[in-house]
Amino acid sequence: MDTRGVAAAMRPLVLLVAFLCTAAPALDTCPEVKVVGLEGSDKLSILRGCPGLPGAAGPKGEAGASGPKGGQGPPGAPGEPGPPGPKGDRGEKGEPGPKGESWETEQCLTGPRTCKELLTRGHILSGWHTIYLPDCQPLTVLCDMDTDGGGWTVFQRRSDGSVDFYRDWAAYKRGFGSQLGEFWLGNDHIHALTAQGTNELRVDLVDFEGNHQFAKYRSFQVADEAEKYMLVLGAFVEGNAGDSLTSHNNSLFTTKDQDNDQYASNCAVLYQGAWWYNSCHVSNLNGRYLGGSHGSFANGVNWSSGKGYNYSYKVSEMKFRAT
């Protein structure tokens, strides 16, 4: 076949391609002409046209199977609090709890036992304070925080004659007097306090001229009522008043209605006091308050090694301190 015949045969095809290219979009969608068989005697042209316009949407397909559950997303922001709900019903009464310690017991467990302990806790002022006996009973006592280092528990005080010390056994057992002046702490209390550990004794005396005297003893204890409040005294240590108590060591307490001394008569009645008399005394600090020198014999607030049997001191204080 000659080339002119081929050209003539392909002219309509070229025109068709030109038309389709004109109608196709400007994108890379033009028809493609492919000529095959160039080496053979026959030539074959294959024309691939441009894509047609999209057809109408088909009907909606069936829903596919559910996919696997996705992982939990991050928490969202907290929402606004809702309104309060109605008050709930009252619950049932619970079982009672164990009984707690009473206030008094707690105070006893942690409270001071002596004036010296109060001093170590920072109570530096002399005055009346509450301490606790071994049976947890509270007891108000006069603490001397000034004399000889402080920490003394005062159990006897004479100062103005305002209180009568010529009393019976029951009065000396329980104690008597006034916190504002003269008093005896009570033999039961003195026993309970001195039965705890070791205590030293100090006696302070002041005459009507303002002169001070004292006597100290290494240890001091008063036995219980079954032993008639016997005096158990240690050695005399020092003091310008001299020793007028050692001779009363191991003596029983005697009052006007209970005679426990070693004399034929009742020493408490003879010398108008109450004391650890033997036969009868060299000191009588619970005797009559006679205001200094007196003509009667040995019935005043006497300390014989100090100012003798005929001088009644203005001030007498007996006190003990834990050692």
UniProtKB/Swiss-Prot annotation:
Residues 75-86 have a biased composition (Pro residues). InterPro entries: Collagen (IPR008160), Fibrinogen-like_C (IPR036056), Fibrinogen_a/b/g_C_1 (IPR014716), Fibrinogen_a/b/g_C_dom (IPR002181), Fibrinogen_C-term_domain (IPR050373), Fibrinogen_CS (IPR020837). It is found in: Secreted. Residues 106-323 form the Fibrinogen C-terminal domain. Ca(2+) binds at D259, D261, S265. Glycans are attached at N249, N302, N310. SUPFAM superfamilies: Fibrinogen C-terminal domain-like (SSF56496). Residues 55-107 are annotated as: Disordered. One of its GO terms (molecular function) is antigen binding. Residues 55-66 have a biased composition (Low complexity). Residues 52-102 form the Collagen-like domain. Residues 87-102 have a biased composition (Basic and acidic residues). Residues 1-26 form the signal peptide. Its main location: secreted. NCBIfam families: GGGWT_bact. May function in innate immunity through activation of the lectin complement pathway. Calcium-dependent and GlcNAc-binding lectin. Belongs to the ficolin lectin family. This is Ficolin-2. It comes from Sus scrofa. The lineage of its organism: Eukaryota, Metazoa, Chordata, Craniata, Vertebrata. The gene is FCN2.
